[in-house]
């Protein structure tokens, strides 16, 4: 890898997704109990895409991110990143994958940077550890810090940086070896709303400038609303996807989101909880095909003859 020549953005291919998860399961064993974190999850992400994963605590979103990062192996299914199946990689292959294919940003800033190194030293360290030339590593570090807006803070240690600045350094560290995939687990979770928006702006800018694929786990609806595609996970499966749209009326631009329920490969459909509560659907429901539509009714709904 030539760090003096940054990777050019790759054109997105609708026929060959960069990330493919099929029927993905992850089961954790805790003493005599088994906890199923992912339950047959299916997901496709295009190369160069910027997307968010949302969901309640325990829904499986951080587990999915750890699997994509090569930090945790799924129990069953397929997980392909760039055409390579993470389930069949050797331990040595996974180390190489984590070093060069993926960058990771944690929520806790203390996990992202070393406190006794300056910002530029933190960024150049992964390059040097991977056998890169120190001179090239230093130039690359300065370039990345400039891209995240910290060119004037490069010689400062993390304890003298604000929380937002520390996360910007963390993003630069994650991109040091020019990975095509950047994963961020609640990167703005410990920041105020204004700083969180600024940090997300950095992620969006890097996605556009470098062509890096970015997957962000977030609880922040304000951040999620700025992303073109948001995937919601519930009970270890993808439940809904929403897409950000922009329309023009000749004078102004309007931003809105189209939300879709996801039907998996076995035909399972997760209906949003608020919908179930509104129509009082609990354990069972009636399905009826009416004029090209499928109606979902409470089990005690009156039965009408179908035409």
Language model segments and positions:
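ABC ATPase NBD coupling module
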Residues: 32-33, 86-102, 134
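A short, proline-enriched helix->beta-strand linker immediately N-terminal to the Walker B motif
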Residues: 176-180
